[in-house]
Amino acid sequence: MMNLVLQYGLYILILVVLAIPLGNYIGKIMNGEKVFLSKILTPCENFIYKILHIDKDEDMSWKKYSFSVLAFSIISLIVLFLLHIFQGFLPLNPEKVSGTSWDLAFNNAISFVTNTNWQGYSGESSLSYFTQMMGLTVQNFVSAAVGISVLFALIRGFIRVKQKGIGNFWIDITRTVLYILIPLSIVVSLALVSQGVVQNFKQYETVSLLEPITLEDGTLVTEEVVPLGPAASQIAIKQLGTNGGGFMGTNSAHPIENPTILSNLFEMISLLLIPVALCFTFGRNIKDRRQGIAIFVAMGIMLVVAMAIVGVNEQIGTPQMALNGQVDLSTINQAGGNMEGKEARFGIATSSTWATFTTAASNGSVNSMHDSYTPIGGMIPMLLMQLGEVVFGGVGCGLYGMIGFAILAVFMAGLMVGRTPEYLGKKIEPFEMKMAVLVCLATPIAILIGSGIASILPETVNSLNNSGAHGFSEVLYAYTSAGGNNGSAFAGFAANTPFINISIGLSMIFARFVPMMGTLAIAGSMVKKKKVAESVGTLPTHNAMFIGLLIFVVLLIGALSFFPALALGPIAEFFQMLG
C-alpha cells in the first residue's frame, strides 16, 4: 500500500508543479497578451486570419458564438465521415484498407468531433494512415480547442460588465491550437519518440516470434505482424486534448503506443495537465486566484478519494482471490492484487491511477482493461464519468461543467439564507439557473436513456459475453462513456453494429452540444450584468465551506441519478462475489 501512496503523491506533485505556470500561460493566450512564442507564431496567426477573412475586432454575441461552434463542428463531422467512407481511394494507405461502413463512419466522425473518441474498431486494422492523420489527429486538436474556447467565452461573461460580446470563436480556436496545443504536442511527441513510440509511414512488418505458439486447431504460428505508423504525434494530442482515441486497438496498453514506464508517465501527466491548468487560468483571469484554487481543491479531493478506492480494491482483489491468502501481497517481484487485464510492466498502482485519471478527465485512453477490474474498482471510473466529467473533466468542458454545478450550489445556499444567489459578483437569476440545470443534467439524460433502450433490445443482450450484473455493467459503461464524452469501454459485447453505432453517436452529440450551448447562454446573460458589491450576506465561494458544498452538490446529483442503475450493475456484482 505504501507503493500506492508514494506513486499517487508523485503523480499529483508533478501535475500541480507543471499546471500552475501553464495555467498562467493559457490565461495570457485567452487575453491576447504577448508570450514567448509570439514572435514565431503571430505571423502564422495573422496569415490564418487573412486567408480565412476573419475580423480580429469582431466581438460575437453568445448566439453568434454558438452558431460558429455548431457550424464548425458540422463541417468537421461531414469531412471526417467522408474520409472514412473513401479512405480506400486516398493516399498513405500502405495496408490497402478499404472504406468503413456508413454507420461506423457516422459513429467515429461524431466520436472525434465531440472529443469523445469512442472506438468500436481497431485502428491498426480499420483505418489508413491518411485517415488517422488528416482525420482523427486534426480533430484531436480542434475538438479540444472548441472546448477551451467555450470556457474562454464563459470566463469573459463573468469578467466583462454591461457588454454584449463574449469574444470571437475563430480567434479563440486559432490561438488555442497555435499557442497551446501544437507546442505542447511537439514536446510530448518528442518525449514519446525518445522512449520508442513509433513515428513513421512504413508498411507493417512481419517478425519471427521468439516463442512460436500452437493454436487450438494445431496450427503452428511462428511469425507476427507488427503495426507501424505515425503514432507518437497522435498519441501526444490524444492525451493533451483529453481525446483518448488510440492509434492501436488496445490503446496505451499496446507496447508500441506505450513501451516504457517513462512513456507511461509522460502520457499520464499529459492526460490531466491542461484540465488542471485551466483551474489556475480561471482564477488568474477573473482576478481572484482563490476562486480557481477552490474549484481545483474540490476536484482534487474527489480525484484523490477515487484513486484511493480504485487502488485499494484492485490491490485487495476479489473475495475469490483472497482465498489464496497471498494474491493481494505486493513484493519486489510481483504487483499482487487483481492483475487480470493489466500490463505486468505497469502493475496495480500505475494502472489504477491511469484508470482514475482517464475517467476523471473525459479522456478515455487506457493502459489496462477496465472490464477486468473488481466490481468496486470498475464502478468508480464509471461514477466519475456519470458525475458529468467535472472532476477536472475534458479540456474546457470539465471546468465549465463544474462552474454549472457551482451556480447550482450558490443557488441552494441562497435559498437557505433567503438571498438572491451571486457568483463571482453577478446575480444568478432564473435564466442562469435553467441553463445550469441543462448543463448538469444533459449527461444523466444521455446515459440513462441510451443504456435503458440498449439493455432491453435482444441484439444487445444476445451479444453480451457476460450475463447478469456484469453484462449490464458493460452496457451501462458504454453509454456512460458516450454520455460523458469519455470514450473508454468495458467492451464485452458487439459494439460495431448499426444500432450501437447510431445510438451511441446520438448520445455523444447530445452530451457534447447541449451543455455547451447552455454554457454559452450563461456567458451571454452574465456579460450583460453589472457587478454586485459584496456584503455581509454574500456567500464566499473560495472557502472550505463552499468547497464542501460544491462536492456535496456534485455527488448528490450523481447519486440521485445513477444509484438505481449502479445497484443493478457493479454493486449487485460486488454482493454476488461476497457470496
Swiss-Prot record:
It comes from the Bacteria. It is found in: Cell membrane. The chain crosses the membrane at residues 2-22, 66-86, 135-155, 177-197, 260-280, 292-312, 391-411, 437-457, 490-510, 546-566. One of its GO terms (molecular function) is potassium ion binding. It is a multi-pass membrane protein. The keyword Iron does not apply. Keywords: Cell membrane, Ion transport, Membrane, Potassium, Potassium transport, Transmembrane, Transmembrane helix, Transport. Belongs to the KdpA family. The system is composed of three essential subunits: KdpA, KdpB and KdpC. NCBIfam families: kdpA. Part of the high-affinity ATP-driven potassium transport (or Kdp) system, which catalyzes the hydrolysis of ATP coupled with the electrogenic transport of potassium into the cytoplasm. This subunit binds the extracellular potassium ions and delivers the ions to the membrane domain of KdpB through an intramembrane tunnel. This is Potassium-transporting ATPase potassium-binding subunit. The lineage of its organism: Bacteria, Bacillati, Bacillota, Clostridia, Eubacteriales. The gene is kdpA.
